[in-house]
């Protein structure tokens, strides 16, 4: 399954990329963010970050490994999380006039059995909601923060 959604921001792509890929900013926009585990890196292919999020009332660790890190253009990574199918993610940063379009993509193979029903019906909907929440939080951050000097 592939879930994809995009949103345009009125800040330069360089500013958006720098903010979004800086792990210190993740608590400001990542839905359910609890903490980033020590030793996590997120700036080059091969880096791995372990993020703890609150999902359905429980803390869960999400392990993410960067596959491609192209400044101001693209970040791709894989993720594993207990109880969910492994996933492939794309974060696209597309210049658009004075701003940029941030396009989020998640691909996963639904599991077999009852887990597959969840993956096909509820997980895709949850991913879309997380995308929308991320977009709204970033909109607030970019609207309220002065540009870096």
What do the PLM-derived regions correspond to, one by one?
Residues 48-54, 76-82:
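Short beta-strand segments that buttress and anchor functional surface loops
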Residues 78-133, 149:
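Beta-strand/loop substructures that line and gate deep hydrophobic ligand-binding cavities in soluble
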Residues 2-4, 59-63, 85-90:
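Short, surface-exposed coil-to-beta transition loops
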Residues 1-40, 44, 137, 148-149:
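Hydrophobic ligand-binding cavity/cleft-lining segments
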Residues 24, 127, 131-135, 139-146:
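Short amphipathic alpha-helical signal-transduction/dimerization elements
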Residues 10-14, 41-43, 67-72, 92-103, ...:
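A short, structured loop/turn motif at beta-sheet edges
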Residues 54-60, 110-114:
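Short, cysteine-centered beta-strand-loop-beta hairpins and adjacent loop/turn segments enriched
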Residues 16-20, 26, 49, 66, ...:
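Hydrophobic pocket/interface hotspot
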